[in-house]
Amino acid sequence: MVVIRAFRRNDLDDLYRICLQTAAGGGATAYRDPKLVGHVYAAPYAVLSPRSVFVAEDSHGLGGYILGAPDTRTFEARLEVEWWPGLREIYRDPADTLRADWSSDQLLIYRIHHPHNTLSDIVERFPSHLHINLLPRLRGRGFGRRLMDRWLLTMQEMGSHGAHLAVGATNLSAIQFYRACGFQELDRPSPVSSDPVWFGITLSNRIRQH
């Protein structure tokens, strides 16, 4: 049986593990520092916005999660004060080296030192944002949809009127999933760009439809 439940503090190591195993570009084999991906895409949500984190757990342990922030601008500001400074002391900014030579680790470290904020027109319409990851054993069984439903309802209860996310343009299965959950495509990069595809959902419309 798979249980969808709220995050607990002792789940943090599992968030790091799942985040690494599901990372684009090779997952666990792509990074020398196994904590880096989680430092950017998982742990800050568990620490700074734990009410916005839910997990899927089966007899083997945690197999997936959804996490995010109800107010993206507030979260970005908190990262700059409460999260990035500590990591910047640990990881050296690679900006003074040739970008073409950067490793997967250095690409993430650069993001720690130079985070880019979400475009204002997206945040104004869809203030919340999310990340969702499932290990293969839980995919295709409806648990991603259950996590999404739980998270979106929680965001609405917290006062949000919309949520957004970004996904790689070549990740067709994820794009199909988000569309099935009610997200609408906001912006698609040119075919030669490495930029992500942005999706958004108006929460009042979605809840009314379900």
State where each predicted segment sits.
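Active-site rim helix/loop that mediates acceptor-substrate recognition in acyltransferases
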Residues: Y31-V53, S59, L67, P115
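Conserved GNAT acetyl-CoA-binding A-motif
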Residues: F126-S128, M155-G168
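Conserved acyl-donor/pantetheine-binding loop and adjacent beta-alpha core of acyl/acetyltransferases
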Residues: R73-H131
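Glycine-rich acetyl-CoA-binding "A-motif" of GNAT/NAT acetyltransferases
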Residues: G61-G64, S173
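Helix-loop element at the rim of GNAT/NAT acetyltransferase active sites that forms part
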Residues: R17-R32, P44-Y45, S160
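Conserved catalytic-core motifs of GNAT/GCN5-like acyltransferases
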Residues: R73, H164-V167, R179-F199
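A short beta-loop-alpha structural element at the N-terminal edge
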Residues: V3-R17
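Conserved acetyl-CoA-binding loop-helix of GNAT-fold acetyltransferases
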Residues: H131-L134, G140-E157, Q176-A180
